[in-house]
């Protein structure tokens, strides 16, 4: 459905379904990207899951799963995209992170840890890749109205709105617009964790 909507806008679009935390699946996806579009110019790492609950109640399998999806997928995609960017001496990597990557969240310890890792990787890669003309930045999202937050009741949302100075949750299109801005930002803007949270944290 999304692919159809994009194509209706006159934009060339392909879709790929798979577990991006799996290295071989990621390799297959980038093979498809190269076949349809050629080299990778812009990479947005947006795969992510969350597990809500006490740290002591989390199983090792749950810990490994969230680490593989939230951090492993970033490794996989960067690993396959960066060679194209180095060859072109240009490129943009945009990692979708969270305010919890800096602040940490009770009952979301693993999620917070993964986003902290993404933030550190963003800064490290920015330094490593800047000589090759590649910019690496992250968007630290606050409460965004997506399926990940669909578990919140109406009462929970009202309480949350009271905490956020903007008085609402962010919209997915606002995160998307910021990603588009970063994709075309000045090349001197790199290594930054840009917060999108309505002045919440």
Protein language model features and the residues they cover:
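C-terminal helical subdomain
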Residues: 138, 162-189, 196-198
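Short, small/polar-rich loop/turn modules that mediate ligand/substrate recognition or access, typified
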Residues: 130, 135, 189-191
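Substrate-binding pocket helix/loop in short-chain dehydrogenase/reductase
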Residues: 54-55, 62-64, 160
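Active-site loop immediately N-terminal to the catalytic Tyr-X3-Lys motif
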Residues: 55-56, 103-109, 131-132, 167
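Active-site helix of classical SDR
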Residues: 78, 114, 122
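Residue(s) in the substrate-gating loop at a strand-loop-helix junction
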Residues: 98
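Alpha-helical segment proximal to the catalytic Tyr-Lys
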Residues: 83, 127-131
